[in-house]
Amino acid sequence: MSNKVLMIDGDRISGNEVRAQNVLAVTAIANIVKTSFGPIGLDKMLIDNIGSIVVTNDGATILQKIDIEHPAAKILVQLSELQDQEVGDGTTTVVILAAELLKRANELVARKVHPTVIISGFRLACTEAIKYINETLAVKVETLPKDFIVNIAKTSMSSKTINDDSDFFSKIVIEAITRVKTIDYKGDVKYPINAINILKAHGKSAKESTLVEGYALNCTVASEGMPKRIQGAKIAFLDFNLAKTKMKLGQKVVVTNVNDLEAIRDRENDIVKERISLIIKSGANVVLTTKGIDDLCLKYFVEAGCMAVRRCKKEDLKRIAKSCGGTVLITLANLEGEESFDTTALGIADEVVQDRLADDELIIVKNSNKKSASIILRGANELMLDEMERSIHDSLCIVKRTLESGTIVPGGGAVESALSIYLDNIAATMGSRKQLAISEFAESLLVVPKQLAVNAALDASDLVSKLKAYHHAAQTDPSKKSYAYSGLDLFNNKVRNNLEAGVLEPAIAKIKCIKFATESAITILRIDDKITLNPREQQGGDHEGHGH
């Protein structure tokens, strides 16, 4: 039916044409990130409209920085963000896999297989794949040697800039995660990554990065006359200015007597003095604020022997308040409009100290019962430090997920190859058209080992064929069960047991990756019509056609 018959003020594309467009857009997105995949992947340089540069090979970061207009491509960008939030790593894998599934699904549609059949086949394949990972491929962490967690961190770093120093950084990551270990009210062990602050200090080499006990702030005390160390700290968290109160612009005060003018000035000073005395009387000896503190206020704090720190990040303040049992206040006024400072808003810490680290001064909040840690990264330039921060964050997320879920799988394309063989066997037992969809799903999974090999400048066909042979043997010959952990060794151009080699990933990362990629592919595959409405004409333009 044409647009004229439907009276649509816009463009309408339907059927195979819209699918072809969607697949083209999604493939274009996957092509951007696929060369950055794996331990020998390349980096991307992204320059925005104001000229700031980002150099990274993190899939989620690359896609976030690109301004994408196509709606189907946007789904893939959201997919990588979701993977980043849920797991922290595997963002490139999920995009490549979703694009491959879509490409193959589109080929099936061209061969007159109905999209509904493909969707149900993909759903079945996804369910079977996850079941197989949980029952056969996943390994409980209790059965592994003690240093397995170091290998998890190293695997996560293998594709990043810090790969050369992965031994050094994996130890820092593990130590930081161990320090923030907590047990919640249900008795579950949790590793809150928010309690780990990552600071970047320009200069020196990456290997001079350090781990500091306590939560570090990239700030200094507001005045040199203040103490640099306070033990048994009671901390006030403020999200407002501590400055002399001035009347707003545009307000008028008519004064008939000169003395009244002086009285107004005195009252302005007294208001701020009263506020500070309220804070000090509550017992606070450390004041952290996100805004400024003027000289008049500093004088009162110095006299009281208080430590005051201004211009803290709001995020940092919230985290410290949470760990110290305090509250961030946005005003001292209560519901009646009177100003007071409730002592319950104070946070308690063992010690707040200003420490010198290399060329920088830092404020460190130490608390023995509420654990926190800070990683201070050193590097040659800002671009390198930003990429190091992303790598460390991904690694922290992966280690957290592994410790909380308690199961791992071998990396290097082992899971995808095993699932490909397994799903092919399942497809052979199907008597319906779903067989085609499951078979294509199985073939799509091989894009992961293929892309790993291509990026490492190796013969992908040869390596993937060997890998498939190993996994086929593992699933048919009971004496070769250990072959199920076979993955690629990209540095030596061979297939090896990646469980023994220490190339490990959390099982949850693989499961979520397959789930998210399948769901996204299905979402885009279901679209068979695209209607783009023309933008409304602006007011005062052509008024023809109004009032129908």
Swiss-Prot record:
Main location: cytoplasm
InterPro entries, alphabetized: Chap_CCT_alpha (IPR012715), Chaperone_TCP-1 (IPR017998), Chaperonin_TCP-1_CS (IPR002194), Cpn60/GroEL/TCP-1 (IPR002423), GroEL-like_apical_dom_sf (IPR027409), GROEL-like_equatorial_sf (IPR027413), TCP-1-like_intermed_sf (IPR027410), TCP-1_chaperonin (IPR053374)
MF term (GO), any: ATP-dependent protein folding chaperone
A GO biological process held by the record: protein folding
Pfam hit, one: Cpn60_TCP1
TM region positions: none
Swiss-Prot/TrEMBL keywords: ATP-binding, Chaperone, Cytoplasm, Nucleotide-binding
GO cellular component terms, A-Z: chaperonin-containing T-complex; phagocytic vesicle
Compartment(s) of residence: Cytoplasm
Oligomer and partners: Heterooligomeric complex of about 850 to 900 kDa that forms two stacked rings, 12 to 16 nm in diameter.
Family: Belongs to the TCP-1 chaperonin family.
Known role: Molecular chaperone; assists the folding of proteins upon ATP hydrolysis. Known to play a role, in vitro, in the folding of actin and tubulin.
Name of the protein in question: T-complex protein 1 subunit alpha
